[in-house]
Curated annotation (Swiss-Prot):
Name this protein carries in UniProt: Thymidylate kinase
CDD domains: TMPK (cd01672)
SS bonds (residue pairs): none
Family: Belongs to the thymidylate kinase family.
Alphabetical UniProt keywords: ATP-binding, Kinase, Nucleotide biosynthesis, Nucleotide-binding, Transferase
Keyword Transferase on entry: yes
GO cellular component: cytosol
Catalytic activity: dTMP + ATP = dTDP + ADP
The keyword Glycoprotein appears for this protein: no
Top EC category: transferase
Originating gene: tmk
GO biological-process terms attached to the record: dTDP biosynthetic process; dTTP biosynthetic process; dUDP biosynthetic process
Task of the protein: Phosphorylation of dTMP to form dTDP in both de novo and salvage pathways of dTTP synthesis.
Species the sequence originates in: Cutibacterium acnes (strain DSM 16379 / KPA171202) (Propionibacterium acnes)
Length: 204
């Protein structure tokens, strides 16, 4: 297909969005064609789904319904945004992807992560990132410091502990794809490690 698919994952407050933006800035400076995107919300359908699943004002959403909504966003996002950019040979920088759905809607909501993963694989036509950057942080230091919380950020300590552990389990199961970084390190240290990994993918 061409292109390079870079995904940022991690618990709330880990700094993944900050690092995704820093990578976006570096790619711009280097003149490398790229696209920065996010899930949920970077398609016309995803914008509406994002409002439903994250707004604290939304009514109760069952765990299975939530998983289906997130995967509907993924299906549209991959078809409309990600695959076209990769076919153009761009670096796609994505803030959250399949593993967030498995960790949050699977482990976090106490659904079967395997079933959620199968659904996500189908929704994304099996598209796997070239690298998944996991910024690991204790939930008490991440989600705990966010003042204005959305529905998932406000889900409670046990929820976020399950999410963190499942991210680490996924990283252990896919060591070649994952780059696990301690989110407590400096922004500079983290961004340099990410740039080094992405440079290697660009030069392969």
């Amino acid at each position: 297909m061409g292109g390079v698919f870079v995904v940022f994952e991690g618990g709330d407050g880990a700094g993944k969005t900050t690092q995704a933006r820093l990578l976006d800035q570096w790619l711009t400076t280097e003149g490398i064609p790229h696209l920065m995107t996010r899930e949920p919300g970077d398609s016309w359908l995803g914008q509406r789904i994002r409002e439903l699943v994250l707004s604290p004002g939304s009514g109760p959403i069952s765990s299975r319904a939530e998983a289906l909504l997130y995967n509907a966003d993924k299906a549209q996002h991959v078809d409309e945004v990600v695959i076209p950019a990769l076919r153009e040979g761009k670096v796609v920088v994505c803030d959250r992807y399949v593993d967030s759905t498995i960790a949050y809607q699977g482990a976090g909501r106490a659904l079967d992560p395997g079933e959620v993963g199968q659904l996500a694989c189908w929704a994304t036509t099996g598209l796997v990132p070239d690298v998944t950057v996991l910024l690991d942080v204790d939930p008490c230091e991440g989600a705990g410091k966010i003042a204005a919380k959305d529905r998932l950020e406000a889900a409670g300590d046990e929820f976020h502990l399950r999410v963190r552990q499942h991210f680490l389990d996924l990283a252990a199961a896919h060591p070649q794809r994952y780059l696990v970084l301690n989110a407590r390190k400096s922004r500079k240290e983290i961004s340099e490690a990410i740039r080094q990994r992405v440079t290697g993918l660009l030069n392969r």
